[in-house]
Amino acid sequence: MNVGIFIPIGNNGWLLSENAPQYKPSFELNKEITLTAERYGVDFVLSMIKLRGFGGKTEFWDHNLESFTLMAGLAAVTTKIKLFATAASLVMPPAIVARMASTIDSISNGRFGLNLVTGWQRPEYSQMGMWPGDQFFGTRYQYLSEYIQVLRELWGKGQSDFKGDHFQMDDCRLSPQPQADMKVICAGQSDAGMDFSARYADYNFCFGKGVNTPKAFAPAAEKLIEATRKTGRHVTTYVLMMVIADETDEAARAKWEHYKAGADHEAIAWLGQQGAADTRSGADTNVRQMADPTSAVNINMGTLVGSYATVARLLDEMAEVPGTEGVLLTFDDFVQGVAAFGERIQPLMKSRVHVQSPVPSQAEAERLAA
């Protein structure tokens, strides 16, 4: 199973809590996390794009770096790990994104890929006068379908004359083209989003669900398998999960309860209001899950809480779900969490025995000792 890190491009990572670690994003912080991940053989890092936060006492996501420029910097200081930036498609024309991606492909020597998002939080775009109106919720994947076709044409042949409802290319050129096949990620959860991923993406992200229920996301993975049967393409699932680990299950659970007790209710309320704005996409969108009050303290991503051994076992169970190629991990404390993953969790994972790391897998160590 592949493992990626969802690096903290926004303040406080993914915990809306006064009791969680409080920090601002910086290049140095993300460089430290990425270099640690690379050292332990983690496969990739991905940064989101967020143009306006949720406020509240913790000023959640009010402080953010920009995804492409951050990943360009990380490309220059890494050698092996793959890097994915996120394009806010509403405000970044596809021809410009194609060129930026090709540039980071050059910096990284072919280690770059792209995460495409449609945009769901109206204030991110209305603050710039660039929100197209709430009807966009119902047409956003048609828009993104044209967007990615322009990207693929420019990356593939260096020229596009694409004509659609949203984009009109007139002998648009791109050179140099990427040296590596440019992989594209989407996070489609609704029927329209899943159909888009099955047609155009290489990987589809979905949210994990619940606390210590590692296979609860399986219906989303099966839904993607069904969608790709219609398109005849190979697209795999990656699952977003938060890891809260410690020496014992009890210590990890105490941290989780402490974070929940400090929930930033003002920021959570803002998230709920923004999630309710989309009345056109159905009840199964990612933002609907994010805003659910059940575990909004970490935007309802699946959460693994336990000892290092418990978390390793739960991650291995996730790898057993058909169609699942990997996980995208967040941590309560990224600096400590990524190091603990490499030192204490990954060596216990049966699904990671192939990884080249300074800390060998327990299974490999036992094999060599036999």
UniProtKB/Swiss-Prot annotation:
Function: The FMN-N(5)-oxide reacts spontaneously with NADH to produce FMN. Requires the flavin reductase RutF to regenerate FMN in vivo.
PANTHER family (UniProt xref): ALKANESULFONATE MONOOXYGENASE (PTHR42847), ALKANESULFONATE MONOOXYGENASE-RELATED (PTHR42847:SF4)
Catalytic activity from the UniProt record: uracil + FMNH2 + NADH + O2 = (Z)-3-ureidoacrylate + FMN + NAD(+) + H2O + H(+); thymine + FMNH2 + NADH + O2 = (Z)-2-methylureidoacrylate + FMN + NAD(+) + H2O + H(+)
Native source species: Variovorax paradoxus (strain S110)
Name by which UniProt lists this protein: Pyrimidine monooxygenase RutA
Coiled-coil annotated residue ranges, if any: none
Superkingdom classification of source: Bacteria
Keyword field contains Flavoprotein: yes
Gene name for this UniProt entry: rutA
NCBIfam families assigned: RutA
One Pfam entry name: Bac_luciferase
Chain sites annotated for binding FMN: 49-50, 115, 124, 140-141, 190
GO molecular function (one): uracil oxygenase activity
GO biological process, one term: nitrogen utilization
InterPro entries hit by this protein: Luciferase-like_dom, Luciferase-like_sf, Pyrimidine_monooxygenase_RutA, SsuD_RutA_monooxygenase
Enzyme Commission numbers on file: 1.14.99.46
Keywords carried by this UniProt record: Flavoprotein, FMN, Monooxygenase, NADP, Oxidoreductase
Top-level enzyme category: oxidoreductase
UniProt record similarity statement: Belongs to the NtaA/SnaA/DszA monooxygenase family. RutA subfamily.
CDD domains: Alkanesulfonate_monoxygenase
